[in-house]
Amino acid sequence: MELGSDVSSSFAHAVELIGGIPDLNTPEREVLVKVGVFAPKQEQYTTIPVARAIVESFSETPKLWFIESDNYRGTGTKRLQIWRELYSDRVVPYNLSEDTDTRTVTIAGEEMALSHLLFESRVLVSTHTLRFYEKGSVIKNLFGLPPMKKKAQFHKNLDSVLLDLFEVVGGIDLAILDGTFAYPGPGSGQKTRIPANVFLVGRDAVAVDTVGAALMGMKPEKMPIIQEAISRGLGEGDLDNIEVVGCDFLEMQERIRPSRKRKKK
């Protein structure tokens, strides 16, 4: 979907195109918005206008929690301040690392304590940026659910960790890739983000990551995270079976072409 000057209207239209979210936007269910931000200085995170549009799309929900956890670069509490202008009595930041009410689960063969918020009847929204990264974006965003500050030990089995987390919390109810900017990623010939002004919204997180990866020049059929998600039955990872509405796919690819150029070796 093209991101117009009125971001909220563009987002609302995108939600309509995927059939709306009446089952998610209800007075009976709170919403967890998993924002993804590794380090604020990198500016690779969902923009405030898109985050505001997400909040506005859940007009009926009694409470929205913007959630993040600590990492070795700092606390989740501090990183969540990026969206502080959106916070109110209804929209609140929450550091998962500070929750003492947890449930122990097994992730990639190891026990892990996760926040109680993740196991109650809440809607889970995962929002991240359009980027060149082999582990995707909205699914990789789940790596911010574990509360520990140092998570490097999980990188050796990262695909399993991410997909186990996906299954343990009941999946992602709404996946959003903010393509206000496209980020080329490590090893790219493009060193800075470029304006793309597109975004992807979908109920199938695997499909959203698949389309996002293809837009950035990657081949989903060669991405282990996507293929493992398919084998587990977690979503659709075949581009031929994914309907993209609201914007021409090839046109979107052309728009972000500068960020897809790779260095020749």
PLM-predicted stretches and their roles:
Residues M1-K265:
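N-terminal and secondary-structure boundary signal
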